[in-house]
A protein has these predicted regions:
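Structured catalytic-domain cores with a bias toward divalent-metal coordination
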Residues: 1-233
Length: 233
């Protein structure tokens, strides 16, 4: 049975807002996994995916098939989910300050104590994910090919994840300093040194493969690029 590890953050007027979080223990033989969605609170698809996944995880745990400890935060941003204007959900930016909800996580995580409710919320999310071996932060685009956004240090191992998720494109990023959630978690684990060259990965002069790798491109339903390592089109 999932353990409720939810926590509260302060709203703009100081009232408590709940961040729902649950943990499935598994048998401990697999890696620790952290899954979350809704940092940008108007990006709905990931929230739905994780709510449905929790049902499957509950069944798998009950049947003794779950190997990993899995933490799920299906709607990570109670501050943004309540922001409406003329009937439209505005969940990308904090209405009171204009702050992008997925920026500044690195600064917030370093504060002791955080100064604002946004910083408290961001630091709490980073701390919750800090012990994970695998972390996926789900976002939704308006209109785009399915893509995986992955740090260079996890490539080419990330091809297996891209194949499993049936992605068309993998966007490979270096340390950019934008303070996004994934950037802050990377920093927490010290993934600053490029694992292939043994040097810091800020500002590669050779950026031929820095931004986009086709995986796998499709045209008229037929794969153009095939993953030779996994054999998955």
């Amino acid at each position: 049975m999932a353990q409720d590890i939810s926590f509260n953050v302060r709203s703009n007027n100081g009232d408590p807002l709940r961040v729902g979080a649950w943990r499935f223990e598994g048998d401990g033989s697999g890696p620790k996994v952290h899954l979350q969605a809704g940092v940008h609170a108007d990006e709905i698809a990931g929230m739905l995916v994780l709510h449905l996944l929790m049902q499957r995880l509950q069944v798998a745990e009950a049947e003794g098939r779950l190997k990993s400890q899995v933490t799920v935060v299906p709607q990570a941003n109670p501050l943004g989910i309540g922001q409406f204007r003329q009937g439209r959900l505005l969940g990308r930016f904090h209405d009171a300050t204009g702050h992008n909800f997925n920026r500044g996580f690195d600064q917030s995580a370093a504060m002791n104590p955080p100064s604002t409710n946004i910083q408290e919320w961001q630091k709490s999310l980073v701390q919750l994910a800090s012990s994970a071996d695998v972390m996926l932060d789900l976002h939704t685009d308006d209109e785009a090919l399915p893509y995986l956004y992955v740090h260079r240090s996890f490539w080419p191992r990330g091809r297996e994840l891209a194949a499993a998720m049936k992605m068309d494109v993998a966007i490979i990023w270096d340390d950019g300093g934008d303070g996004s959630f994934e950037n802050a978690v990377q920093d927490f684990h010290g993934v600053r040194v490029d694992r292939f060259s043994g040097r810091r990965s800020r500002g590669y002069p050779d950026c031929r493969n820095r931004f986009v790798t086709s995986f796998p491109a499709r045209h008229a339903g037929r794969p153009i690029v095939r993953d030779r390592e996994t054999g998955v089109p």
